[in-house]
Amino acid sequence: MNKPKQILRLRKRAEFLALRNGEKRRGPLFLLEVRERTEEESQTAKIGEKPRAGFTVTKKNGNAVIRNRIRRRLREAVRCHAGRDMAPSTDYVIVAREQALTAPFSRLTEELSRRIKAKGERRGDGKRRTERPESGPVNGK
């Protein structure tokens, strides 16, 4: 069996906030925020090319026991399966939804791998790729 690739963890608030401006990939089980690090950021943190992952489970998902269970499932899915798909010098934040607890583990890992591999679905600046057409005059006026 292949040894899983080492994935470092995001732990500081500033690291999580930096990803708010990154690309967002939405799914039914979680939201994935992705951002490539600059060389300067990698050297400052002394982490090199390794990918980093952070996990967020809000209180909306339940009490501490439920939130920790969701976080453990996501960590294991990244460690065993999805970590192989992570790009070097990239940070990922996984914001869990309630369904991440009840979904089969195989679906969780498949969805996570698919979202990690998908590139450029959104611009990351909160804007849509195509602008909506301007509204014309109402009733010909």
Curated annotation (Swiss-Prot):
| GO cellular component terms attached to this protein's record | ribonuclease P complex
Q: Which reaction does it catalyse?
A: Endonucleolytic cleavage of RNA, removing 5'-extranucleotides from tRNA precursor
Keywords from UniProt, A to Z, are:
Endonuclease, Hydrolase, Nuclease, RNA-binding, tRNA processing
Q: Where is this region: Disordered?
A: 114-141
Segment forming the signal sequence: none
Q: Where does the chain cross the membrane?
A: none
Under the heading InterPro entries, the entry gives: Ribosomal_Su5_D2-typ_SF, Ribsml_uS5_D2-typ_fold_subgr, RNase_P, RNase_P_CS
Basic and acidic residues bias located where? 114-134
Q: Among its keywords, does the record have Cytoplasm?
A: no
What EC number(s) does its UniProt record assign? 3.1.26.5
By sequence similarity, the record places it as follows:
Belongs to the RnpA family.
- Subunit comment: Consists of a catalytic RNA component (M1 or rnpB) and a protein subunit.
Q: Which HAMAP family match?
A: RNase_P
Its protein name is: Ribonuclease P protein component
The species this protein belongs to is Brucella anthropi (strain ATCC 49188 / DSM 6882 / CCUG 24695 / JCM 21032 / LMG 3331 / NBRC 15819 / NCTC 12168 / Alc 37) (Ochrobactrum anthropi)
Biological classification of the source:
Bacteria, Pseudomonadati, Pseudomonadota, Alphaproteobacteria, Hyphomicrobiales
